[in-house]
Amino acid sequence: MEKKIVKDILFLSQVSQPASQDDLYLARDLQDTLLANRDTCVGLAANMIGVQKRVIIFNLGLVPMVMFNPVLLSSEGSYETEEGCLSLVGVRPTRRYETIRVAYRDSKWQEQTITLTGFPAQICQHELDHLEGRII
């Protein structure tokens, strides 16, 4: 179900709690909300729809990638860029990594690891920041 985007900075500044299998429904809510905002959005974290759980979604080709309890394992090739966010007005400067490796659980609650480069890596890092309460 599509959810309203949270813009409360105090709420977004809180560190999200680990997700459990009881939170699998968030994948559908995040996917519906991402689809509804596809013209201006390429990724979401659960706190952006009002749930303080460690769940993110971002565009990765034809099918959005959903990650439960993602953990950044490694990164390389830092660079400066600017990003926007549905929860904020305008764009802001930030530092990202060209290549990252992330461990997570998928929608079947299986442990996975993925290496991302370029724009998908940038989007994933932005959403990981949301889970830590970091706002660009």
Residue positions per predicted region:
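Positively charged
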Residues: 1-136
